[in-house]
Amino acid sequence: MALVSLPPQKLLERLALPSGPVSMVLDTDTYNEIDDQFAVVYSLLSDALDVEAIYAAPFYNSRSSGPGDGMRKSYDEILRLLERLDHPSAGFAYHGSERYLEHLDTPVQSEAVDDLIARAMAPRDGPLYVVAIGAITNVASALLIEPAIGERIVIVWLGGHPQYWPHTREFNLGQDVLAAQVVFDCGAPVVQIPCKNVAEHLRTTVPEMERYVKGRGAIGDYLYQIFADFHTDHFAWSKVIWDISTIGYLNNPDWVPSEVRPSPVLLDGATWGPEDPSRHLFRVAVDIHRDQVFGDLFRKLAQHA
């Protein structure tokens, strides 16, 4: 389903490594666990990133009664983070989709989708980076409603596993396969940050959080508390903060090595099909330098405090 007709050279330009100030929106299932909160804060404390809006994404796990409830809880969590950062929420935080994409050609309407389309189509120098760290129905729906945004955005998504992995049923992609198919097939510029063997390197511990996050203002104390409360037994325990991978990539792509390849074929069973060299290109992360990303986050928290 090619919705976007970017010339190959223009697509390559859009897939070039980010440099200088980046205009972005963040699409996040903020309440599904505790890593999105770190990504929200990291993005807002990054001077090189101009975060124009934050969208709540749907999710369904033990922390919600369904995708819509997950989206609403994520929206409320976004507000809690903004309050602790003294950042206004009006005209900045938006409710997203109440459900996942159910048909490849039928978008899910929401205020987040409307805002994304309006921002993407507004005059600007360079692309709008759409950073998605949850189920990707909001982004897919915007592309289905207004395919022209695909020529004006770059999608950076934490979702799925590498193509060499036997399946790609991780949380973000596995609950939203149809939306992921729209995104990978549409022809828009996509940067994928896989979970297995890439983002999963971003592990940290309670002692490290206590040393470098706790006491860094109201937001540092909040991040520390939700991290410490997430697991009862902290002995020999670490936790992956998956979502900061996307923000680390935008702050310094050298920290998240990547390569350009033909866009993958996502099958209905959440596995990858054989690579097709005739498909449009995308960029995929192949590694991540954990210490550089966490070091940058810790320094920004200290400076903010």
Where in this protein do the model-derived segments appear?
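N-terminal acidic, glycine/proline-rich low-complexity segments
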Residues: M1-A305
